């Protein structure tokens, strides 16, 4: 009886310990967020790795829609109106789908953010689409990587790197006059807060 109680105790301890961990994923999820203009941009994606394979043109075929990552489709979120690839996009959440070719990629922002991979991709749900040139790199990027570069108050580039391939997706603010008004209002609020602090002192 004591042995049974002991074994149950050990099992309970193991279960409790295991709840603090998760099984290592082949394509772990990553979320990146960049403060931009008066809000922020967030990308949520799975990170597959090369692992000695030929990626573009083989694992990811040319001319076919790709989920831009692994597992659930990659998503991007905007908290203000922007232009992506020169095209206006309302604030909200979008799935990113890509049709890669050797020298250029077609980038699509799609309304179906719950899609698992590209299996249920519906072009009727597209918000915008545009093409960007492919840049070949010398250094191997082992795991798929999204990042933000060339950041200013009005523009930034979303960078996608994998294997020996890189693309740059330009993002800029839309409705500049509205954004300028928001900035002025924020400045007024900050000044009001400083004035209050001065009175308290």
Language-model segments: which ranges?
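Bacterial Sec-dependent N-terminal signal peptides
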Residues: 1-21
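Primarily secretory-pathway and cell-envelope proteins
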Residues: 19-61, 118-201
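Aromatic- and Gly/Pro-rich amphipathic surface segment
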Residues: 57-73
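Mid-length scaffold segments of soluble, non-membrane domains
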Residues: 68-121
């Amino acid at each position: 009886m004591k042995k049974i109680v002991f074994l149950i105790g050990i099992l309970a301890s193991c279960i409790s310990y295991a709840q603090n961990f998760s099984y290592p994923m082949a394509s772990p999820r990553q979320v990146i967020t960049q403060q931009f203009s008066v809000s922020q941009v967030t990308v949520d994606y799975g990170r597959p790795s090369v692992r000695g394979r030929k990626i573009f043109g083989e694992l990811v075929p040319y001319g076919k829609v790709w989920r831009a990552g692994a597992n659930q489709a990659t998503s991007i979120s905007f908290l203000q109106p922007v232009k992506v690839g020169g095209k206006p996009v309302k604030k909200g959440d979008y799935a990113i789908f890509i049709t890669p070719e050797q020298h250029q990629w077609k980038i699509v922002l799609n309304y179906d953010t719950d899609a698992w991979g590209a299996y249920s991709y519906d072009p009727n749900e597209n918000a915008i689409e545009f093409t960007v040139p492919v840049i070949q790199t010398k250094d191997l990027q082992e795991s798929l990587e999204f990042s933000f570069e060339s950041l200013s108050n009005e523009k930034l580039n979303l960078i996608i790197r994998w294997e020996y391939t890189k693309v740059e997706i330009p993002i800029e603010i839309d409705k500049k006059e509205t954004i300028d008004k928001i900035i002025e209002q924020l400045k007024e609020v900050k000044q009001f807060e400083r004035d209050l602090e001065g009175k308290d002192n």
